Amino acid sequence: MGRVVGIDLGTTNSVIAVMEGGKPMVIANAEGVRTTPSVVGVSKTGERLVGELARRQLVLNPRNTFANIKRFIGRRYDELTDESKRVPYTVRRDPEGNVRIVCPQLSREFAPEEVAAMILRKLAEEASRYLGEPVTGAVITVPAYFNDSQRQATRDAGRIAGLEVKRILNEPTAASLAYGLDRRDNQTILVFDLGGGTFDVSVLKVGNGVFEVKATSGDTQLGGNDFDRRIVDWLAEQFLEAEGIDLRRDRQALQRLIEAAEKAKIELSGVSVTDINLPFITATEDEPKHLETRLTRSEFEALCEDLLERMMRPLRRALKDARLQPQDIDEVVLVGGSTRMPMVQQLVRSLIGREPNQNVNPDEVVAIGAAIQAGILAGEVKDILLLDVTPLSLGLETIGGVMKKLIPRNTAIPVRRSDIFSTAENNQTMVEIHILQGERQLAEGNKSLGRFKLTGIPPAPRGVPQVQVSFDIDANGILQVSALDKTTGREQTVTIQGASTLSQEEVKRMMKDAELYAQQDRQLKARIEKRNRAQTLIAQSERRLREISLDFGLYFAESKRRRIESTIRELKDYLERQDDRGLDLALAELQDALFDLNQETAARLRDEEGEGFFEPLKQTFASLRGDGNRDFERSWDDRGGDRWDADPWDRSRRSTPSYGYDDRRSPVSDPYRGERWVEEQTSMSRREPVRDRNGGNGSVRPEPAPRRGRPTWEEDQPPRRDRSSQPPAKPASGRRWNDGWDDDDDEWF
């Protein structure tokens, strides 16, 4: 059982949220950002990019990068305005009159639903990565003024993305859920939603867990992008007047203008003037051209006066349909990033007479509300009742091309309405039912949702047969129409699908294509990650070899180092040849070789640490065992001897008597006078003096003499004795050793 999430599929940005611990939480994408650009692109290598990666190539690859897809979803080509068609990529009409997006890189065309499905799949994958479990269902939000065509197209996009669309939710309603979740007092809320490509106004009654939509209105062809286009046109006209070049005819220059306009719009929300600098915007045969100008907030507001007037009409209509006055509104909730513009906030203040509530994040509040609705459907959130409405009137065409409304706008859903119709001619055996959506009186001025025929009507005079037509709208706002001949009982039922511009066969084909391309994308991503991992491991291995050479020398672990160097050469060769199989083997081999080298290095470090830090402990334990004489010190002693030599005090190992210091002799300044030397077991080591404080019987070990540093061989120091019977060489003529030895002890030799 997978998780159900809430998705705000926006024109400019999209957001995904989920219920965690009973509270909604927005999920950040792989880039660490909570909003994902609603942009899809195809790179020059054929890789499909979604989000920020696609947005980065808008200027360099405008023909293969698609933004603002939400404006085309669920619409036919003839319904598009000239403004919406003015995009850097190619939008064309297919033989059925639907909108198709041309992708030159892949030499194919995409339906807007397919492009939207790529965005939804990207969001679902990010949520699955965060949650650690698959995401199978979603509540997707749409503008409240979306017609049935656009709602059905959004549902199809979710199906193509591999998601079960649990609910299609109006964006203002979702925002009210997020705003009023913890509020128990009765309030009247006005939600002002100005997104990147759509505009909605909804009036709701909120209290005690009940969210009742009273009225909704809007404009699906008005949004923040229209404000950007005003700046684009202003910049293009200025440049055309100064240089005689229309930048709107150049795809790359147009995209740079769009990005500069969006940046200027954002900056003017916080400052009163902004500078626009676009170097090398174009070039002539003589020289490159630059665009440098300054735009003030007052000039920007003057450019957008007509857009503000277009927003006033839906706002007043929503209040009128709800039978409310501006003073009846308790709270105004702003939704959408474009509501940050000061002129929009001032418009709300002037019409409502109340300061807008800015406690909610306008970019995330819709996704949070969608997550709450997902929690309601999953049983995680209780005691909440949502009563939504249909945004537009629904009816059918009658005699004379007049629209007969069966369900008026702002009717609470789900709802079912019926009416009785008859034939227009004598002996008519078939009637065609034409479903319409809109507010115009004539059928041709409204949106056609579809047609179907009811056949088998018995011949009869005009007006005698009775045909009952029923309209049924579910909680998602999806319409189902049925026609019943009351004479014969013959019934014809149809779910309106023509609104989506896609047949069921096309939807299934796109679902298979999306899964196929998703698998190809995963394989390509895995190859790229493998190559990156190999390059990273090569760099780490080379750095490790350099460090070991500096720390332990060139001859340390020579065989293991040669193995690593050889594997690195093989790995680089596989990378150059793009041999995936060899790359896997070389990667595993290099990891094993590096592990072996690190093990040997760690062992060497442990040995060195043991000789240093743990040496005093070793000496202590050795002295407790009684064998510490030999390991007492490793440095030179005061007589020039090495403490690691054989123990000269152990009389049990030889029969040679030892001699001690003669206390009976008068003290002399010579430190070696009066001492006796014993023969050592190693001929190459120096003699150790033995001084006995108890009369020379050797029963008590003398205390060591204080250190005097490492001795140097002077004339007054004793020579190295040889155990052989040969006497030492005589000194040079005129010189004699002052060794302090008793000449009477000739038996020593």
UniProtKB/Swiss-Prot annotation:
Residue ranges for the region (Disordered) are 643-749
| Sites bearing Phosphothreonine, chain numbering | T198
Short name of any one Pfam family annotated for the protein: HSP70
Disulfide bond sites? none
Key words of the record? ATP-binding, Chaperone, Nucleotide-binding, Phosphoprotein, Stress response
* Free-text function comment from the UniProt entry: Acts as a chaperone.
UniProt name for this protein: Chaperone protein dnaK3
Origin species, per record, is: Synechococcus elongatus (strain ATCC 33912 / PCC 7942 / FACHB-805) (Anacystis nidulans R2)
Q: What is the lineage of its organism?
A: Bacteria, Bacillati, Cyanobacteriota, Cyanophyceae, Synechococcales
Q: Which gene codes for it?
A: dnaK3
